[in-house]
Every structure is written in C-alpha cells, then in structure tokens.
Curated annotation (Swiss-Prot):
Protein name: tRNA-2-methylthio-N(6)-dimethylallyladenosine synthase
EC top class named in words: transferase
PROSITE patterns per record: MTTASE_N (PS51449), MTTASE_RADICAL (PS01278), RADICAL_SAM (PS51918), TRAM (PS50926)
Superkingdom of origin: Bacteria
Subcellular compartments: Cytoplasm
Length: 474
C-alpha cells in the first residue's frame, strides 16, 4: 500500500521551497506520496515560521489537532521543522511529548535517517544543528511543478536586525556554489520552467564559490542564470539595501531576463527608528538606490516591508515613513504591527506605542500603498503585457491566468496549450487584485530561446586553455 506524507507549511517562500524538497526527498528514499488529507498520512510534518506574533502557540495548537490522529494511530510519525523548531528545540517535546522528530531548516536533508530511527526503536530525534552547505548536497534532483520555480541560492543572515529571529533560527549566511545553482536551474528549464525565483534570507549577499575556486558576486550569478536558454524571467527574494551594490543595478540595465519588479525591504522611513532596528542604512541611502535603479530601468516597480509601532516610534517617525512611501511610490508592501520575537534585542525594548495607535498607523499605511498600487495598475490599462501562463483562473476555470513582469495577476480567455508558455495580452480592465485582458500574440510569434541540457550550461561557463586547464567565462 502506498505510504502517504502530509506537509503543512507556514511562512516565507524559503519554507515553501524547503517543503517541496522534503517531499521530493522522502519520495526518493521512502516512496512517500503527498496527500492534502492529514488523516490519510503515515508521516505528518509541520514546517513552521517564527516571524509572526504568537508563532509558538500556533504550532502547539496545530500539534494538538494532530495528537488526536496519533491516539488513533500510534504508528503515525509527527515531525516539526522550520524556524520555530530551531528556536524551541527540545521544549517542543516538553509540551507535546507525542512529537517524534524535531529538525531545523539546515537539517531537513537528514529526515530519511530520522524517520528510520523513529521506526526502528521509537525513540524521538532532535536535530537543530547548522551543518552549512551539506543540506543542498544531499537533496534529490529538482522536480518542476509548473512554469515557475523557486531555487534557494543561500541560507541564513548576518545582519542581526534587532527585531528578527532569522540569524538565530537559520544561522549565518552560507552560499551555494555557482555550479550547483546553475545545474539545478538548467534541470528545471529542461522540465519546462520559464521563470526562476532565487531565494535567500539576504539573497543579494550571495558570495558563492565558482568551479575554479574564485568567489562570485550576486551580479555575476544573475548574468549566468540569464544566459540559460529556456529561462526567460528571473526574480529574487529577499534582498537587503546594504548589499544592493552598483554592479547589481548594472544587471538591470543590460539583462532583460531580470524582471522590472523588486522587493527591497526598508521597514521604516525614520533614520532614528532604522538605527533602533539595527538596519545600518538611512532612508536617504535607500532612496539613492531606488533613484539609480530607475535610471537603469525606468519602468521598475518596487515593493517593500514595513513595521509600524516599533518601540519608540513617534508620530513624527511615522510621518517620515509615509513620506518615504510617497517619494518612492511603492507598488505594494508587506506591512505589520510590531510584535516582539522572543530572544531578539527588540524584545527587551519598552513596547511604548499604544495598540490602537499601532492599528491606526497600519491602516493609514496600507490604505496609501493600496492607492498607489491601483494607480500603477491603471497605468497598465490599454498596454500590452507579456504574461507567463500558470494555469486556469481561480475565478473561472474556463479562463487562463498568469502574471506580468511586475507581478500582476491577469485573467484572460485562452486555450490549454498556452499553459506554461508566454502570451502577450492587452489589458482591458483593472481590478483591486487582478487585471483582465485579451491575447494579442502567442509564444510561437516571439522567437524565444529553447531550453538546453544542464550539462551544456555548465560546459558553456568554462573554456579550456592550451594546456587543457579550464577557466571561467560567463
């Protein structure tokens, strides 16, 4: 009988990537098939996130539901991974003794051995160590699920912002070698992937090793990925202003595969609050980056992260944030009320902004961002946009849906063979959360590049001299 695996994922795109790798790994080693129904599963895995408020309590609430399943089926294996697991460790078993496996983001590749250990002697396993790059070396080949894919290029963060748990739960920055990344992307391209999203907690800090032992920059990597035939769009998430160097901006100037959309968190428009947050940049420095980006790519649209009600934030500080929002003309944002994360320096600060004031500031900020986003959408009315068709529309299964370069969802009438390909669509209607249009050109008329083999991608980045010694050539 087929063994079943159920994974519940909370949090960021990195967690989504990790969960997909868990599924591929346990399919390869144990033959587990994914199921959306927890009651059917032989193994339940909870991939957690510690960014939001009351993250720990949310975990134990979910585990309480799964405990009932374990009581009915004592052989059921329950595992907790992700950032809450890394943060809480053995404390999870103290509150939920029925949990069999606790693993961190850097030890998910050891899941097969952990499951074997639990199956063998029923003793629980806790592994929340940070074994650096080993995780990527032991994962199976990537498996495409549609025309878009996430590819993790690095883990961890060295910035230690005062409100953030990432350095404590995912460790410090570790970059994958460039060859490993390029080979994975080429494998995905060969399976029909057209758009890759390069992932990292601080993705533009990537400093991976090249095959010849030299250290590459993020700008180098972007150009190498753009050269892979079949990959027509590149996104990356999430970047830090302090690492947004001029060579990255130059890639926007000369590399059309890099989309005209950037998520660049700023958190606040007040230098005083930024200093309290440990952000190491000013609002003016942030605006200087945006100014240079728009000189290189005039149509680029920017999204960001904001925290309102940070300890010590005054009305004047908040007004400076609102001014930054207007000056940059952000297209969208992920914005939240401050809530202290245990173990961070900000948790020891006096949370002196009244809750109602926090809510009011968040409402004002989000309303302004929504107005700006709608203005950006209205500018697209009557224009022709290139859409990567991802599948059928959620609103109408008789229609197709895809995304523009600037991350707008567009619904339109089309045929099934368009799925996974690009189409040019004239935008005819604008709505708060989506656009509507009509197809004016199909991919057959675009002359796009055809995917090449992964081996040829690696070979193309190298060239041998007369002695047969390879050297790097982008």
């Amino acid at each position: 009988m087929t063994k079943k695996l159920h994974i519940k994922t909370w949090g960021c795109q990195m967690n989504e990537y990790d969960s997909s790798k868990m599924a591929d790994l346990l399919d390869a080693t144990h033959g587990y098939q994914l199921t959306d129904v927890a009651e059917e599963a032989d193994v339940l895995l909870l991939n957690t996130c510690s960014i939001r408020e009351k993250a720990q309590e949310k975990v134990f609430h979910q585990l309480g539901r799964w405990r009932l399943l374990k009581e009915k089926n004592p052989d059921l294996i329950i595992g907790v991974g992700g950032c809450v697991a890394s943060q809480e460790g053995e404390h999870i078993r103290q509150r939920a003794h029925y949990v069999d496996i606790i693993f961190g983001p850097q030890t998910l590749h050891r899941l097969p051995e952990m499951i074997n250990s639990v199956r063998g002697d029923r003793s629980p396993v806790v592994d929340i160590s940070f074994p650096e790059i080993e995780k990527f070396d032991r994962l199976p080949e990537p498996r495409a699920e549609g025309p878009t894919a996430f590819v993790s290029i690095m883990e961890g963060c060295n910035k230690y912002c005062t409100y953030c748990v990432v350095p404590y739960t995912r460790g410090e920055e570790v970059s994958r070698p460039s060859d490993d990344i390029l080979f994975e992307i080429a494998q995905l391209a060969a399976q029909g992937v057209r758009e890759v999203n390069l992932l990292g907690q601080n993705v533009n800090a990537w400093r991976g090793e090249n095959y010849d032992g030299t250290t590459g920059t993020f700008a180098d990597l972007l150009r190498l990925v753009a050269a892979i035939d079949g990959i027509d769009r590149i996104r990356f998430t999430t970047s830090h202003p302090i690492e947004f160097t001029d060579d990255i901006i130059e890639v926007y100037r000369d590399t059309p595969e890099l989309v005209s959309f950037l998520h660049l968190p700023v958190q606040s428009g007040s230098d005083r609050v930024l200093n309290l947050m440990g952000r190491t940049h000013t609002a003016l420095e942030y605006k200087a980056i945006i100014r240079k980006l728009r000189a290189a790519r005039p149509d680029i649209q920017i999204s960001s992260d904001f925290i309102v009600g940070f300890p010590g934030e005054t009305n004047d500080d908040f007004e400076k944030t609102m001014k930054l929002i207007a000056d940059v003309n952000f297209d969208m944002s992920y914005s939240f009320i401050f809530s202290a994360r245990p173990g961070t320096p900000a948790a020891d600060m006096v949370d002196d902004v009244p809750e109602e004031e926090k809510k009011q500031r968040l409402y004002i900020l989000q309303e302004r961002i929504n107005q700006q986003a709608m203005a950006w959408s209205r500018r697209m009315l009557g224009t022709t946009q290139r859409i990567l068709v991802e599948g059928t529309s959620r609103k109408n299964i008789m229609e197709l849906s895809g995304r523009t370069e600037n991350n707008r969802v567009v619904n339109f009438e089309g045929t099934p063979e368009m799925i996974g390909k690009f189409v040019d669509v004239e935008i005819t209607d604008v709505y708060p959360n989506s656009l509507r249009g009509k197809v004016v050109r199909t991919e057959d008329e675009m002359g796009l590049r055809v995917a090449e083999t992964p081996e040829s991608v690696i070979a193309r980045t190298r060239k041998e001299n007369e002695l047969g010694v390879g050297f790097y050539q982008p």
